[in-house]
Design a protein with these regions (language model features):
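Catalytic zinc-binding patch centered on the HExxH motif and its immediate surroundings
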Residues: 1-8
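Short, flexible/disordered intra-domain loops and linkers
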Residues: 40-52, 167-170
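The DNA-recognition helices of helix-turn-helix-type DNA-binding domains
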Residues: 41, 65, 146-150
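Amphipathic alpha-helical oligomerization/scaffolding segments
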Residues: 82-98, 102-106, 110-112, 116-233
Length: 235
């Protein structure tokens, strides 16, 4: 448990069977502390803890700290020590993640073919998706995009294939794919992808954007409050 108001980390040792579990949880709570400290440095005393604490930024920092803990031999996730789990993991990776990735690649190619045939027959492809295949359009778009890119390794699994297929440059796709194959978490890879696409805001611009966003939200809430009060008054 992390208490942002007092900056305290509380660990109950009876909740853990091994040191590995204790270290994992300690790193988790320490990540909350670091995120809170960063926000305090940016926003000062005006900082208020967000209700949503497990953000993408949190998981990226958490996984980076876990890597440091592994490098220093404080923590490890050693599935080799559990033969049954190792065998099951290999089965999942080969016969489910990779097999499903291959299947979805082929699915994407078939959707491209169906799109072309719909256009040839003067049939709206969107209607074909909606009422013949009953497939959500966003899902069809993602699957089709995966099928159009041949240099993605199905071994990373379909969800990661979808993410990497949004990268336009093949060399950057290859780098992102290699990161996943080497054990980087998808959320870390996604964050790195975003960093390359975005120019960092300076602190003032960031606060101005937040101010505008909050002002808009307050205006909408005030409008709703006025409506509710008027409705109550007329009852």
């Amino acid at each position: 448990l992390y208490k942002p108001d007092t900056h305290e980390i509380i660990l109950h040792n009876k909740n853990f069977k091994t040191d590995e579990e204790l270290v994992y949880t300690a790193v988790h709570e320490y990540t909350h502390h670091l995120i809170a400290e960063e926000q305090l440095a940016i926003n000062g005393s005006a900082y208020m803890p967000n209700a949503k604490v497990h953000t993408e930024a949190f998981w990226v920092k958490f996984h980076s700290l876990l890597k440091i803990a592994e490098e220093k031999n404080y923590y490890s996730i050693n599935i080799d020590s559990v033969p049954e789990l190792k065998e099951l993991t290999e089965n999942i990776q080969k016969n489910y993640l990779e097999a499903n990735g291959k299947l979805m690649q082929e699915f994407g190619r078939l959707l491209s073919k169906a799109h072309a045939l719909c256009e040839k027959a003067n049939i709206r492809y969107e209607d074909y998706l909606d009422r013949v295949l009953c497939l959500p359009r966003n899902s069809a778009r993602d699957i089709k995009r995966v099928g159009q890119i041949s240099d993605i390794d199905p071994a990373i699994g379909f969800d990661n294939m979808k993410m990497i297929s949004t990268i336009k440059k093949s060399d950057e796709r290859a780098k992102a794919q290699e990161q996943i194959l080497s054990g980087e978490s998808p959320v870390t890879v996604r964050s790195l992808m975003k960093q390359k696409c975005q120019t960092p805001d300076d602190p003032k611009q960031k606060l101005e954007k937040e101010k505008n966003r909050l002002a808009k939200t307050i205006a909408q809430l005030q409008q709703r409050l006025d409506y509710v009060e008027e409705t109550l008054a007329s009852m």
